[in-house]
Amino acid sequence: MALTRGGDPAPSVCLVVWFACVYSLLILVVLLLIYRCCIGFQDDLVSRTLAVYRACIQGPICNQTHNSTS
């Protein structure tokens, strides 16, 4: 005696696709974290992007001097 309503015991295709996407994103995040921990936080794209983001938040540096050789 089946406990399902409607007779189809298989899960919905949409639900399976949703779980597959969430699972793959979770694996991707874990692999990226492992990669970042293995190589360290060197001068890579993520570190440069964070540095640019922090510089944009802090605003322009007023004490910076420009060397002009003319």
Curated annotation (Swiss-Prot):
Topological relation to the membrane, as annotated: Single-pass membrane protein
TM regions (residue ranges): 14-34
Location, primary (coarse class): virion
Keywords annotated in UniProt: Membrane, Transmembrane, Transmembrane helix, Viral envelope protein, Virion
Localization of this protein: Virion membrane
GO CC annotations on file: membrane; viral envelope; virion membrane
Protein name, as recorded: Uncharacterized protein UL74A
